[in-house]
């Protein structure tokens, strides 16, 4: 069956396209033609214009495991905290499969303590672990409501989470749950006893290397270079991961042994951490160099960046969001 559009429909579509382009062009001057500005008119369900309540920004990074937020968003968190924002990290899973020697119970206990140590380094409001088992986050209504209730309690201005396309089932599931919450967070009768948000959060999707169905769109790029020392210090707290499990998984245990005393050989420790866990940050700085120059006219492309895509499932960004994220 062929579908035909009348002349009026074509004209209306053309006008709407032009209006969208005008809004997109006018939306971003200070940070060049940052593609994130195109979302002023691109969030069809969440188009609210409710102003921000004065006070520190609240940012909630919802990752699947107790090191996801640190690895992929740590430099962003360090920047925002330095600018006065309140930042909360979340691990929906307890990390109990993340070791090759410890049993599940011990792994979960060790990782909980490691996240507490990392939280102190970052200066987080908190580092919450919801307790689901690794590779066991259900994609169901009760789990979605657990996540939604925690979001409503913190009332974030911005949420950062995973994209749907990712190598780990927990990453995909958590990302879908957060996006599913997006519009519903403002509905008073959705969560029984919950606190509906009068102003829904902006949702950002953290960077990844996947290209199917498409690569991430670099709407917002954060310079990591000024924060790498703190990033290394925080990752160093998660001994079971970066010096044990992941080293074993990658077959690089000999490099860990070569570091020796990590409390003394800080340079060696940091070199090791950056060698293996900043590859994406370095790759993104290269592949998104043109986007960086659009967003930060006149500034040299950094060596490492954290990249984010603005999700259409959250509210549209406002000038304050870009100033917090992309401003000096």
What are these regions (language model features)?
Residues 12-20:
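Bacterial N-terminal signal peptides
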Residues 31-53, 191-192, 199, 213-214, ...:
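C-terminal accessory domains and tails appended to enzymatic cores
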Residues 26-154, 184, 325:
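Active-site rim/loop-helix segments in enzyme catalytic domains that contact anionic ligands
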Residues 88, 116, 121-208, 216-217:
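Internal alpha/beta domain cores that form substrate/cofactor-binding pockets in large enzymes
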Residues 99-102, 214-218:
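Short acidic, glycine/proline-rich loop/turn micro-motifs
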Residues 2-12:
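Bacterial N-terminal signal peptides that target proteins for export
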């Amino acid at each position: 069956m062929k579908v035909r559009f009348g002349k009026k429909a074509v004209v209306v579509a053309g006008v709407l396209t032009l209006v969208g382009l005008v809004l997109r062009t006018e939306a971003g001057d200070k940070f060049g033609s940052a593609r994130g500005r195109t979302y002023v008119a691109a969030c069809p369900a969440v188009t609210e214009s409710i102003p921000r309540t004065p006070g520190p920004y609240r940012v909630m990074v919802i990752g699947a495991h107790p090191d996801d937020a640190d690895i992929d968003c740590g430099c962003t968190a360090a920047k925002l905290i330095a600018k006065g924002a309140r930042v909360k990290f979340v691990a929906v899973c307890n990390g109990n499969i993340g070791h090759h020697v410890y049993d599940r119970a011990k792994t979960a206990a060790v990782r909980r303590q490691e996240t507490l140590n990392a939280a102190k380094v970052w200066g987080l409001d908190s580092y919450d672990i919801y307790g689901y088992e690794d590779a066991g986050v259900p994609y169901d209504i009760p789990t979605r409501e657990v996540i939604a209730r925690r979001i409503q309690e913190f009332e974030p201005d911005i949420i950062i989470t995973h994209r749907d396309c990712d190598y780990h089932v927990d990453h995909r599931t958590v990302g879908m749950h957060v996006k599913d919450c997006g519009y519903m967070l403002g509905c008073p009768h959705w969560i029984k006893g919950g606190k509906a948000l009068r102003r829904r959060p902006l949702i950002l999707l953290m960077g990844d290397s996947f290209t199917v169905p498409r690569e991430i769109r670099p709407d917002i790029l954060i310079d990591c270079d000024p924060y790498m020392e703190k990033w290394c210090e925080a990752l160093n707290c998660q001994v079971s991961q970066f010096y044990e499990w992941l080293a074993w998984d990658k077959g690089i245990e000999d490099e860990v042994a070569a570091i020796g005393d990590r409390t003394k050989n800080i340079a060696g420790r940091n070199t090791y951490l950056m060698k293996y866990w900043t590859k994406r940050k370095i790759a993104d700085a290269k592949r998104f160099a043109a986007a960086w120059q659009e967003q930060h006219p006149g500034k040299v492309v950094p060596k490492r960046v954290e990249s984010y895509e603005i999700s259409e499932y959250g509210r549209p960004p406002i000038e304050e969001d870009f100033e917090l994220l992309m401003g000096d």
